[in-house]
């Protein structure tokens, strides 16, 4: 039986307004409401996006009285770190965040030799009900606000600077939630992530990835935003019969519709689409499915696609496990034989439940 999809948040949350919720015009209006001179808007944005400071009491170039005045009105504490765990010799760090209304989400900071990536959540929980994903099995609590999303980015960037003397280079919307089901807030967050300081964090659009299970109309809408970010389509099966079960949204938008939307995205943006495929033993790893995947992707996207094979990560209560390595290698060979680029993704954080499909926001 297909678990019910949830596209609207069961418990809508409205966190207090934060500077990060506002664009340049909104910041100007907020500053004017407080009776402050217009230049303060740019100054506050520089503190947040440029210096990564979210506590006005640390904004030493502001008058002391002003710091107190804006603490609650423009810089409420939206997320509090409830716990942190690390693995990979400290190179992977998972943070459990608690919001003001008590919901919890997780983000993961990963350091690599030539890049630093933060994997962020866009919703508390997820309504897409994928049976192999811990987040999907937990259901959806609510959407995150733009500022709650951006606070995960700011915290990751600040941790890299303060703990490692390093910079954040990549942001991936691959944490908890379906980003395109929280479309307006996610797009607003992306705009702030890629904008140069003091309007945003200044991360290259090419280094930002937005993942989706295949909300075809929203993929097309995102293409028309012309943000230039990477689209990652979580496919996980090349045939509708299996994908209807593994990715229940397929019952609304079939593979052909998702691939048509992905092709539209590639054509409009000029960006290669990433296809995510969690390899599950004896479920979706058969040679004929590798052949079918290669053929369908080559026909739909030509050279504008890359397949990331993901060894299935264990989740509580799941009866499935990862495909054996020889099966994995043969799957890669067959997809490549169809003329499609394919690699196995480096899995980080499995032992601390921080890898793909494992985030459940438990504990803390």
Swiss-Prot record:
Its EC number is 2.1.1.192. Binds 1 [4Fe-4S] cluster. The cluster is coordinated with 3 cysteines and an exchangeable S-adenosyl-L-methionine. Reaction proceeds by a ping-pong mechanism involving intermediate methylation of a conserved cysteine residue. PANTHER family: 23S RRNA METHYLTRANSFERASE (PTHR30544), RADICAL SAM CORE DOMAIN-CONTAINING PROTEIN (PTHR30544:SF5). GO terms for molecular function: 4 iron, 4 sulfur cluster binding; metal ion binding; rRNA (adenine(2503)-C2-)-methyltransferase activity; rRNA binding; tRNA (adenine(37)-C2)-methyltransferase activity; tRNA binding. This is Probable dual-specificity RNA methyltransferase RlmN. CDD domains: Radical_SAM (cd01335). Disulfide bonds join 119-356.
